[in-house]
């Protein structure tokens, strides 16, 4: 008699692997408080990278478990996997993180089978989880009522958020926060006896900051609320700001930021809480912001297929200068660009395909300091041919035939990245007012400086490789030439040996593969002389090799810079 097919055993092993992953994820996350209290800034960066890498490492480990435990002809019998899915559904029903467990299952399935075997019968293309469930669980938020004064309300808040490192000047902090709150809200709101504060119980940690996150509300309105805390070494914990502007809070949870570390026992509930105070954010971005980037990827994919099914939108080439390495297309009604690697690069590019892939993957694991767009990597996307404008499809097939192929009425995209769509900076400047040009060039220089201080050198700093977000921030998004700043050799141009040297079309000095001459930046970056002069006035130090060498020295000494995800006026 043949043995029954081991669907339940396979499902249990997949879930055991998920438990192991979540345990390691939680261990790294729970260490965030101590790292903050002890000002272990470099450990924070290492922990963030380790937590990002953890998912793929654990998927590979569980893949190995399965292959060792079950014969290939059993494990890889895809016709039986609906039984595994059904068994898995029953196993995860009691969980508080079941949507993450579904995504984990999908990752294991894709690690075992080719993508052309993907179906909703075998996988969770559509979630089986209800978006909100009424369950008995510990409260994830605390509520504070106006008790006589704003100062008393704030004092009650901070009494519930102690640290092993004491607050340096709590009464001074409370006075400043009360003043900022009165500036942010109308006077009648501050005096409204119905005014209350609701805060998420766990503190959110990222880089050098800790964040209290929640909302202010009365019987009629609500406002998001974020209170960033800093550890001033030698001075204790300090409340750095109070932020109630939705756009400012949205930037804190931006796709350009590193992921928060927060103890989130019920991820869906926390994401729904954030969604209520930031209705403009997609849940994919909110999941990603707290470190569940694979769940963010799942939610993004579901939103994409729903958009394609419910609209007449068709893929078109993205506006802007065509890339020398990547080809970029988009859906006009979907705020995302899709990037594929061309088969042949422009002659001026010295990178190869493998290097480009490594560069894009690097971006996910480094501190993006609010200046680099996060990416999601996909394999074997399949779309109906009818969803492409003919000229877009023709261009993709021409420049990347090894990546884009036709399978009857289906377009197969073997490999791509997605990024948030932005307005290319060069196009933005063409339409900008004088004031907007000033703000954009100021922020462009700040973006370069902040990336550099985080040990990232963009390489190709042309305006077309930066975008402007809906909040007016300048963000870098073309990664094929990025490197660590400490790998670059910044040099002054040597003086000419003879008068004829300056007239020559060739340099009179040797140039190594990692050499960069900042004095050459002005004509390289700006054809417009007015913009060139303005940028020189705003950020002229970027043209000096000594400025870059000073940053390199600070990085080598182990200094970790402060880059705040909120504007100066909020502090």
Swiss-Prot record:
<dbReference type="GO" id="GO:0004721">
    <property type="term" value="F:phosphoprotein phosphatase activity"/>
</dbReference>
<dbReference type="GO" id="GO:0008772">
    <property type="term" value="F:[isocitrate dehydrogenase (NADP+)] kinase activity"/>
</dbReference>
<dbReference type="Pfam" id="PF06315">
    <property type="entry name" value="AceK_kinase"/>
</dbReference>
<dbReference type="GO" id="GO:0006097">
    <property type="term" value="P:glyoxylate cycle"/>
</dbReference>
<feature type="active site">
    <location>
        <position position="374"/>
    </location>
</feature>
<comment type="function">
    <text>Bifunctional enzyme which can phosphorylate or dephosphorylate isocitrate dehydrogenase (IDH) on a specific serine residue. This is a regulatory mechanism which enables bacteria to bypass the Krebs cycle via the glyoxylate shunt in response to the source of carbon. When bacteria are grown on glucose, IDH is fully active and unphosphorylated, but when grown on acetate or ethanol, the activity of IDH declines drastically concomitant with its phosphorylation.</text>
</comment>
<keyword id="KW-0904">Protein phosphatase</keyword>
<keyword id="KW-0329">Glyoxylate bypass</keyword>
<dbReference type="GO" id="GO:0005737">
    <property type="term" value="C:cytoplasm"/>
</dbReference>
<protein>
    <recommendedName>
        <fullName>Isocitrate dehydrogenase kinase/phosphatase</fullName>
        <ecNumber>2.7.11.5</ecNumber>
        <ecNumber>3.1.3.-</ecNumber>
    </recommendedName>
</protein>
<comment type="similarity">
    <text>Belongs to the AceK family.</text>
</comment>
<dbReference type="GO" id="GO:0005524">
    <property type="term" value="F:ATP binding"/>
</dbReference>
<keyword id="KW-0547">Nucleotide-binding</keyword>
<feature type="binding site">
    <location>
        <position position="339"/>
    </location>
    <ligand>
        <name>ATP</name>
    </ligand>
</feature>
<keyword id="KW-0723">Serine/threonine-protein kinase</keyword>
<keyword id="KW-0418">Kinase</keyword>
<keyword id="KW-0808">Transferase</keyword>
<dbReference type="InterPro" id="IPR046855">
    <property type="entry name" value="AceK_kinase"/>
</dbReference>
<keyword id="KW-0067">ATP-binding</keyword>
<feature type="binding site">
    <location>
        <begin position="318"/>
        <end position="324"/>
    </location>
    <ligand>
        <name>ATP</name>
    </ligand>
</feature>
<dbReference type="Pfam" id="PF20423">
    <property type="entry name" value="AceK_regulatory"/>
</dbReference>
<keyword id="KW-0963">Cytoplasm</keyword>
<dbReference type="GO" id="GO:0006006">
    <property type="term" value="P:glucose metabolic process"/>
</dbReference>
<keyword id="KW-0816">Tricarboxylic acid cycle</keyword>
<dbReference type="GO" id="GO:0004674">
    <property type="term" value="F:protein serine/threonine kinase activity"/>
</dbReference>
<dbReference type="GO" id="GO:0016208">
    <property type="term" value="F:AMP binding"/>
</dbReference>
<dbReference type="GO" id="GO:0006099">
    <property type="term" value="P:tricarboxylic acid cycle"/>
</dbReference>
<dbReference type="InterPro" id="IPR010452">
    <property type="entry name" value="Isocitrate_DH_AceK"/>
</dbReference>
<dbReference type="InterPro" id="IPR046854">
    <property type="entry name" value="AceK_regulatory"/>
</dbReference>
<keyword id="KW-0378">Hydrolase</keyword>
């Amino acid at each position: 008699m043949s043995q029954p097919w081991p669907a339940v055993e396979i499902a249990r092993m997949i879930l055991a692997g998920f438990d192991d992953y979540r345990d390691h994820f939680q261990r790294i996350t729970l260490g965030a408080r101590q790292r903050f209290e002890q000002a272990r800034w470099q450990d924070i960066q290492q922990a963030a990278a380790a937590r990002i890498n953890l998912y793929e490492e654990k998927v590979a480990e569980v893949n190995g478990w399965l292959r060792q435990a079950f014969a290939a002809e059993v494990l890889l019998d895809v016709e039986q996997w609906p039984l595994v899915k059904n068994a898995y559904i029953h196993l995860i029903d009691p969980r508080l993180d079941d949507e993450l467990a579904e995504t984990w299952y999908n990752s294991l399935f894709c690690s075992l089978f080719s993508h052309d075997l993907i179906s909703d019968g075998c996988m969770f293309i559509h979630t089986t989880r209800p978006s909100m469930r009424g369950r008995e669980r510990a409260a994830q938020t605390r509520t504070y009522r106006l008790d006589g004064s704003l100062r008393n309300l704030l004092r009650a808040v901070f009494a519930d958020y102690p640290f092993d490192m004491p607050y340096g000047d709590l009464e001074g902090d409370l006075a400043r926060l009360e003043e900022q709150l009165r500036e942010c809200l109308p006077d009648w709101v501050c005096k409204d006896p119905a005014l209350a504060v609701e805060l998420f119980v766990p503190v959110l940690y990222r880089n050098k900051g800790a964040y209290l996150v929640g909302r202010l509300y009365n019987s009629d309105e609500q406002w998001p609320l974020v209170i960033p805390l800093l550890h001033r070494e030698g001075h204790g914990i300090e409340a750095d700001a109070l932020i109630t502007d939705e756009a400012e809070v949205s930037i804190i949870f931006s796709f350009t930021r590193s992921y928060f570390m927060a103890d989130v026992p019920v991820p869906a509930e926390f994401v729904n809480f954030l969604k209520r105070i930031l209705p403009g954010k997609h849940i994919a971005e909110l999941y990603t912001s707290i470190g569940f980037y694979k769940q963010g990827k799942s939610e993004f994919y579901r939103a994409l297929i729903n958009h394609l099914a419910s609209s007449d939108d068709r893929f078109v080439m993205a506006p802007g200068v065509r890339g020398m390495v990547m080809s970029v297309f988009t859906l006009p009604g979907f705020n995302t660009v899709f990037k594929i690697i061309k088969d042949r690069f422009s002659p001026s590019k010295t990178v190869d395909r493998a290097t480009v892939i490594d560069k894009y993957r690097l971006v996910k694991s480094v501190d993006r300091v609010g200046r680099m767009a996060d990416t999601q990597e996909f394999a074997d996307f399949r779309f109906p041919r009818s969803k492409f404008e003919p000229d877009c499809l023709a261009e993709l097939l021409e420049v990347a035939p090894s990546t884009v192929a036709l399978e009857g009425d289906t377009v197969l995209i073997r490999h791509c990245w997605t990024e948030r769509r932005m307005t290319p900076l060069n196009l933005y400047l063409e339409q900008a007012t004088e004031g907007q040009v000033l703000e954009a060039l100021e922020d462009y220089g700040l973006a370069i400086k902040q990336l550099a201080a985080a040990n990232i050198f963009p390489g190709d700093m042309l305006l077309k490789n930066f975008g402007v977000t809906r909040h007016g921030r300048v963000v870098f998004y073309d990664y094929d030439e990025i490197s660590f700043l400490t790998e670059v050799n910044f040099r002054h141009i040597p003086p000419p040996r003879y008068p004829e040297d300056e007239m020559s079309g060739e340099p009179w000095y040797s140039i190594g593969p990692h050499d960069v001459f900042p004095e050459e930046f002005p004509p390289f970056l700006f054809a417009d002389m007015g913009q060139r002069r303005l940028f020189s006035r705003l950020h002229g130090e970027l043209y000096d090799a000594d400025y870059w060498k000073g940053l390199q020295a600070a990085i080598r000494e182990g200094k970790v810079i402060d880059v705040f995800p909120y504007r100066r006026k909020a502090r």
